[in-house]
């Protein structure tokens, strides 16, 4: 496949988009902040004057807001813990709940076999990073919680997978939310609770420890939830000789917590600048479509709705490049395998080889890796679309994922330019190729 190299990404311009989007605060799908982000993205795409831009209304997604969350050990000692509600979770009764603490391991069926989950608060270990041995269920992106819910647990606790006083919130809710109160705590507090369960040195001297003495917690979570619609923003550069065939660049604009600078204002910003650069170039043979999607943090809801909206014409999408987490991290990666809806999925080896060829041709380095959970590549792969996923910050030691500390100061402007150049040249290579595209 012949590659003709173009540039046109200005690092400061991409970074400015990141700052504008991050300044909105948390952009939960269907929230007012997300609607402001959608308006910003739409305005920037329309301002090119050379792209056809429209909004695609999604099916309902949970509209969620945290009002308050508290967690306290009440037995065998009293200890207040810092926490925050997990995205999409439900509320406890107004006075909270007091329940025994149960350790559910990694949340696998075998971890629950000897446990009495009824009237309990369950604590789980965090998912493993960059492995394929986690488990998740359809509609629940990063944990299969069906048994916990069915057996009458009163609440759920997840803790960060890295040491520090920050809270990393996992993704547990699908597009309809999570019918269970749930909070996330720090790594240290997670270990503290597990030590209490084992009656180690966490119990102060002088307090008698008995083999069957329970650990009891008080949990209070207050949230507001309702179902609402959101929007994907779609901008099209129509092809000349093969306009019905499409090449996609996809990034999600919603986020889980905090400013969401890297996750995922960084990828949205790259998409905007790549779209502007491509709009100024002659039209390619195939159509290039830029798709800014909602609801990735709720189980890829927006990209699933895009695929569903295509119906049978999804076969006209000949290649899809997904961007997520591109603004900070150790290296540039393309994903080879990940988990989606409880199954291992594979990104396109053919498209990954094109990415690799383009990246090396530009003088940059990119490496393959597996990833514990899919991003918006999942729905496209499931639909049979050759798909690649580019990211940076997937190091096991990257601490800012789904955290308040994901701010613009962690963004590497030059990294955004590199990803933008890779995307421009990959899209144009694919859109101007007359070769049969493989999977």
State where each predicted segment sits.
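Active-site alpha-helical elements of protease catalytic centers
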Residues: 261-274
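His/Asp/Glu-rich mid-to-C-terminal helical/loop segments that flank catalytic regions of hydrolases
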Residues: 280, 288, 397-439
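Second-shell loop/turn segments in exported
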Residues: 1-8, 23-32, 42, 92, ...
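Noncatalytic luminal/extracellular "stalk/propeptide" segments of secretory-pathway proteins
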Residues: 7, 11, 16-121, 127-133
């Amino acid at each position: 496949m012949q590659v003709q190299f173009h540039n046109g990404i200005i690092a400061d311009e991409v970074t400015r988009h990141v700052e504008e989007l991050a300044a909105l605060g948390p952009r939960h799908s269907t929230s007012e902040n997300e609607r402001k982000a959608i308006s910003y993205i739409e305005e920037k795409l329309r301002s090119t004057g050379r792209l056809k831009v429209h909004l695609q209304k999604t099916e309902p997604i949970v509209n969620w807001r945290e009002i308050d969350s508290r967690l306290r050990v009440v037995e065998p000692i009293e200890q207040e813990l810092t926490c925050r509600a997990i995205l999409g979770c439900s509320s406890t009764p107004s006075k909270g709940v007091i329940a025994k603490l149960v350790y559910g391991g990694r949340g696998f069926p075998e971890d629950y076999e000897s446990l009495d989950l009824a009237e309990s608060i369950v604590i789980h270990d965090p998912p493993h990073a960059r492995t394929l041995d986690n488990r998740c269920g359809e509609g629940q992106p990063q944990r299969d919680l069906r048994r916990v819910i069915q057996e009458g647990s009163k609440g759920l606790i997840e803790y960060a997978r890295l040491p520090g006083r920050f809270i990393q919130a996992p993704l547990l809710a699908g597009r309809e939310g999570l019918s269970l109160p749930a909070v996330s705590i720090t790594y240290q507090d997670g270990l503290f609770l597990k030590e209490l369960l084992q009656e180690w040195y966490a119990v102060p001297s002088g307090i008698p420890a008995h083999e069957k003495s329970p650990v009891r917690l008080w949990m209070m979570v207050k949230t507001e939830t309702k179902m609402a619609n959101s929007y994907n923003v779609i901008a099209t550069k129509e092809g000349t000789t093969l306009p019905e065939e499409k090449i996609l660049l996809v990034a999600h604009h919603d986020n889980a917590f905090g400013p969401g600078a890297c996750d995922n204002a960084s990828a949205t910003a790259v998409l905007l600048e790549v779209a502007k650069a491509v709009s100024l170039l002659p039209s390619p043979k195939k159509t290039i479509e830029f798709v800014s999607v909602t609801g990735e943090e709720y189980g890829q809801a927006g990209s699933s709705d895009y695929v569903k909206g295509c119906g049978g014409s999804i076969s006209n999408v000949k290649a899809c490049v997904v961007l997520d987490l591109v603004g900070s991290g150790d290296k540039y990666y393309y994903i080879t395998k990940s988990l989606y809806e409880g199954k291992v999925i594979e990104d396109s080896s053919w498209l990954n080889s094109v990415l690799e060829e383009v990246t090396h041709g530009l003088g940059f380095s990119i490496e393959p890796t597996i990833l514990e959970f899919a991003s918006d590549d999942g729905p496209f792969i499931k639909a049979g679309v050759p798909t690649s996923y580019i990211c940076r910050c997937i190091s096991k030691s990257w601490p800012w994922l789904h955290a308040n500390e994901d701010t613009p100061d962690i963004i590497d402007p030059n990294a955004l330019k590199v990803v933008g150049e890779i995307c421009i040249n990959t899209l144009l290579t694919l859109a101007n190729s007359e070769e049969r595209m493989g999977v």
